[in-house]
């Protein structure tokens, strides 16, 4: 639609592995001539800092290798945070990034993954809802996750440059992805717990057009999946009855033979 109107469509892209299947699908649709990215402007959501000259860790290169080099987005429409900028110029570089986003009319969409600590982009626990693009120290949990996912022996830098929570929330729509049971616990907290800066992804609950895209594994601890009788009417299978009985016994601290009619109601 943006292309037909001659407008830019501005995307903030995360580089996490949970987004790879999304990018693969976008490339597939491009190859089938179902999509074009000629009017797309891309802003990288975060970058490691400081980076060595020939670093293999650059997230923008990961985005290009997986997605951008395989579609028709113009090179001049791809922007990234500068992992090589001098330390005394970091703040100015981050401010310029915010200004450049505004120059293109703001973000239309943000595609994000979520880390085990509830971080989005590189916004670690403690990031405020009004935070803008800035430098941030990488937390221990995120560092372990990065070391496991990055296929390199190169040392992860101490910091990241990242779009802030407010920057991401300014997008017209947001998509958060997570796959597998290892993300089930954090997704339950992100979706169902209270909004808190100790869980940055929970701020997405405040957005009117935020979407969570997860598989059954990552959804495992959501109430609708794990305890559906609490939120909807159920078709009671033997397995579901057993699950509900175990849950009720644990909740009341009673063995099953001690349950009464009152407990069931």
PLM features per residue range, with description:
Residues 13-18, 112-116, 179:
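Glycine-rich beta-strand-to-loop/alpha-helix junction loops that act as flexible
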Residues 121-165:
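Class I SAM-dependent methyltransferase SAM-binding "motif I" and its flanking Rossmann-like core
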Residues 90-92, 120-126, 131-133, 186-190, ...:
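A short secondary-structure junction signal
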Residues 172-265:
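ATP/nucleoside-binding phosphotransfer catalytic cores, i.e., glycine-rich phosphate-binding loops
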Residues 4-5, 34-36, 71-72, 101-105, ...:
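Solvent-exposed alpha-helices and their adjacent loops that cap or buttress functional pockets
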Residues 33-109, 232-256, 263-264:
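Ligand-binding beta-strand-loop-alpha-helix segment within the catalytic cores
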Residues 1-11, 28, 260-261, 265:
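N-terminal glycine-/serine-/threonine-rich phosphate-binding loop
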Residues 24-36, 59-61, 65, 125-135, ...:
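A glycine- and small-aliphatic-rich helix-loop capping segment at beta-alpha/alpha-beta transitions
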